[in-house]
């Protein structure tokens, strides 16, 4: 006989003594004399033990006879309470030796004989919710009964619908403590019954999950529990193919297909009704009193599992296990596609929808779909147009409080989230979390054009628009197009004149937060200072000569990871960015953008001190430092001073005569690579710099600049 069936025989042996115990009936269960409170029904199913056909086949004849005797005793005791309506036909079935599952069908139905409500069984009611009020309104059924677990065990927190069930359950704790046949067990008719109950205590929570350590009293419970770890969902709905871990979950789901709308009707009321029932502990409100009652268990139920790290208490054990993973960092549930790990199976299931593209939640207004119900709920607030949360600084309004809280950080400039690896700081936790992934996970999505890699597929798709020239976002005012929506929104502020970002020191307003941040540095400007702690650390590496990022191809080292990434593109030999004027190709888009300025001759960056103009902001920034900071690096040979150490080292080659850069065509040597590159154009005949007035071409931009002076030269 299976262990499960054997456990039921043990349960069977103390089913009758529980009813026979002197304290098993509460005052609410006594027969009233006259008016007063209604009598609460104790029914056959509350104490019956039912075997499946498979389990019944494994019982011996002696055990089957024992079953019949005990169940007949149960019938007698229930009948003695005066309110059991199944006495005659159930006792007849027992005497005839009917199988237990046949009797269960006879006694589990509890319909009103007059109106036959479509609520089939007490078990179905329990599965559809912890509390359900059913009104019996005909004849002897005129009794209000609430299937709520009112009676709670002080030892383990387990709740029961009837005090008799609680009394019987508490004997398990008493027997577990005494292990003696004495006063606590006086309700048992036979010592053998007590001996069987002792075996329940020894088997209680004997079967342990080998993944999380949770224990169970039956192997079937362990198997059911372990499906949470494996993600296995063996029960599939024939109608919609949705899969479930448990058969009971499938049964509940199938009611939606067959027309049982009890739960749907109850749910729809949540959209129309107010919530009059409030929790005195936390203030949470509920539609129904039964929901409040169930919620109160969170505050009142004893919590047995204490976290060793933070001393927080949890119940049940599964919540305790999930909480501990926040301290240990354990993530046992791994995605098969990208190998990302999660603390719980529910988070893994949510994540997997990002790979499948499944978006089952659709907005009724705009038909946009979402992977998560919470994302849909957030989106739907957009359609209401209601923006209840107002920023006190700039009067901008927001749909959600969380958006307002994030926005306020733009006015204060506070960056509370700092990366411990590179010391970069962030205003928002979401950006900080994304940044941390750059240190821990790879970049599996690579661009076929330039080889640049990305962590997320949507980032790659956005990048590809640079190569294709696709700009689907058009400004309605001026027709200018952009490759992403965020750049379009920034541009629109030019037309609206909207300037929500105000400097708290001088009152100047800006359309973008980035412009405000740049402006605020002018107030806090100090010599040799950097924009942030992270930039200061980067700057200090230039003095120390520290270059921790080496190239695997040529072993050249760099002070910044970003510089290494730019350098590595040289080894691929790919130059996907082409100048439309001279057809010269570049590794990076920024290089192409800078190069285009050489054709126009435009110099938009002008120094206010000496009025010297520059094509590129980087050269302009370097030039400004010549006016503001010293030149600490001095040549010992000629006394010439330099701002940067590498420039001094380059200068020293003039004195030593060192010329390590040799031309492969003519053998001429140079002391730096830039001079060699200029020289090579003599051999190639390359003349990319064309005068826009006479069409003459030059190999160097400096020669073009000198030539253009001749066109602008005027006689006095």
UniProtKB/Swiss-Prot annotation:
Location of this chain's protein in the cell: Nucleus
GO biological process: regulation of transcription by RNA polymerase II
Domain KRAB: 42-113
Alphabetical list of CDD domains matching this protein: KRAB_A-box
Region (Disordered): 515-548
SMART domains in alphabetical order: KRAB, ZnF_C2H2
Molecular functions per Gene Ontology: DNA binding; zinc ion binding
Alphabetical keyword list: DNA-binding, Metal-binding, Nucleus, Repeat, Transcription, Transcription regulation, Zinc, Zinc-finger
PROSITE patterns assigned: KRAB, ZINC_FINGER_C2H2_1, ZINC_FINGER_C2H2_2
Pfam families in the cross-refs: KRAB (PF01352), zf-C2H2 (PF00096), zf-C2H2_6 (PF13912)
Chief location of this protein within or outside the cell: nucleus
Zn finger residue spans: C2H2-type: 151-173, 207-229, 235-257, 277-299, 305-327, 333-355, 361-383, 389-411, 417-439, 445-467, 473-495, 501-523, 549-571, 577-599, 605-627, 633-655, 661-683, 689-711
Gene Ontology cellular component annotations, sorted alphabetically: nucleus
Entry's family note: Belongs to the krueppel C2H2-type zinc-finger protein family.
General function of this protein: May be involved in transcriptional regulation.
Protein name: Zinc finger protein 840
């Amino acid at each position: 006989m299976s262990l499960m069936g054997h456990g039921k025989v043990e349960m069977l042996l103390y089913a009758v003594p529980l009813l026979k115990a002197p304290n098993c009936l509460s005052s609410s269960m006594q027969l009233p004399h006259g008016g007063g409170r209604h009598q609460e029904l104790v029914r056959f199913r509350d104490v019956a033990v039912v075997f499946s056909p498979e389990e019944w086949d494994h019982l011996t004849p002696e055990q089957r006879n024992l079953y019949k005797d005990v169940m007949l005793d149960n019938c007698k005791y229930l009948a003695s309470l005066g309110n059991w309506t199944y006495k005659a036909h159930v006792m007849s079935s027992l005497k005839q030796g009917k199988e237990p599952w046949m009797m269960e069908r006879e006694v589990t139905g509890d319909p009103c004989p007059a109106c036959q409500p479509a609520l089939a069984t007490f078990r179905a009611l329990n599965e559809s919710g912890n509390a359900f009020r059913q009104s019996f309104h005909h004849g002897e059924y005129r009794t209000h009964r609430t299937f709520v677990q009112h009676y709670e065990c002080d030892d383990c927190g387990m709740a029961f619908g009837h005090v008799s069930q609680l009394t019987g359950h508490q004997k398990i704790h008493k027997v577990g403590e005494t292990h003696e046949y004495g006063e606590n067990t006086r309700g048992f008719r036979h010592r053998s019954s007590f001996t069987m109950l002792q075996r329940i205590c020894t088997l209680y929570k004997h079967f342990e999950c080998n993944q999380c350590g949770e224990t169970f009293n039956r192997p079937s419970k362990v198997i059911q529990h372990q499906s949470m770890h494996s993600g296995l969902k063996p029960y599939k709905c024939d109608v919609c193919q949705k899969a479930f871990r448990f058969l009971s979950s499938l049964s509940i789901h199938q009611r939606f297909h067959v027309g049982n709308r009890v739960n749907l009707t109850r749910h729809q009321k949540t959209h129309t009704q107010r919530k009059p029932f409030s929790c005195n502990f936390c203030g949470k409100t509920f539609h129904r009193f039964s929901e409040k009652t169930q919620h109160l268990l969170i505050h009142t139920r004893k919590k047995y599992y204490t976290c060793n790290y933070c001393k927080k208490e949890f119940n049940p054990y599964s919540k305790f296990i999930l909480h501990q993973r926040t301290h240990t960092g354990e993530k046992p549930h791994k995605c098969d596609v990208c190998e990302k790990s999660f603390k719980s199976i529910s988070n893994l299931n949510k994540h997997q929808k990002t790979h499948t593209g499944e978006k089952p939640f659709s907005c009724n207004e705009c038909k946009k779909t979402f992977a998560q119900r919470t994302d849909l709920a957030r989106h739907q607030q957009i359609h209401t147009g209601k923006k209840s949360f107002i920023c006190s600084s700039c009067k901008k309004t927001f749909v959600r409080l969380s958006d307002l809280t994030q926005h306020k950080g733009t006015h204060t400039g506070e960056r509370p989230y700092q990366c411990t690896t590179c010391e970069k700081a962030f205003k928002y936790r979401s950006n900080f979390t994304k940044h941390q992934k750059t240190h821990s996970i790879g970049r599996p999505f690579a661009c076929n054009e330039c080889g640049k890699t990305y962590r997320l597929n949507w980032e790659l798709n956005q990048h590809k628009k640079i190569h294709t020239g696709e700009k689907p976002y058009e400004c309605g005012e001026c027709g200018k197009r952009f490759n992403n929506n965020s750049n379009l929104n920034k541009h629109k502020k030019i037309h609206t004149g909207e300037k929500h970002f105000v400097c708290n020191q001088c009152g100047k307003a800006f359309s973008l937060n980035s412009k405000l941040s740049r402006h605020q540095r002018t107030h806090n400007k100090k010599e040799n200072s950097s924009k942030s702690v992270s930039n200061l650390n980067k700057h200090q590496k230039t003095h120390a000569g520290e270059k921790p990022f080496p190239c695997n191809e040529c072993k050249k080292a760099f002070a910044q990871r970003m510089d290494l990434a730019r350098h590595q593109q040289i080894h691929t030999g790919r130059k996907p960015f082409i100048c439309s004027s001279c057809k010269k190709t570049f590794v990076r888009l920024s290089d192409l953008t800078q190069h285009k300025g050489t054709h126009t001759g435009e110099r938009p960056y002008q120094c206010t001190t000496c009025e010297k103009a520059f094509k590129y902001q980087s050269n302009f920034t370097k030039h400004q430092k010549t006016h503001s900071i010293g030149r600490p690096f001095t040549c010992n040979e000629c006394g010439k001073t330099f701002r940067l150490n590498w420039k001094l080292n380059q200068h020293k080659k003039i004195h030593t005569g060192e010329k390590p850069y040799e031309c492969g065509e003519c053998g001429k040597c140079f002391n730096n690579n830039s001079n060699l590159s200029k020289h090579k154009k003599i051999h190639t005949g390359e003349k990319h710099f064309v005068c826009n007035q006479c069409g003459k071409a030059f190999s160097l931009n400096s020669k073009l600049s000198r030539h253009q002076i001749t066109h602008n030269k005027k006689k006095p």
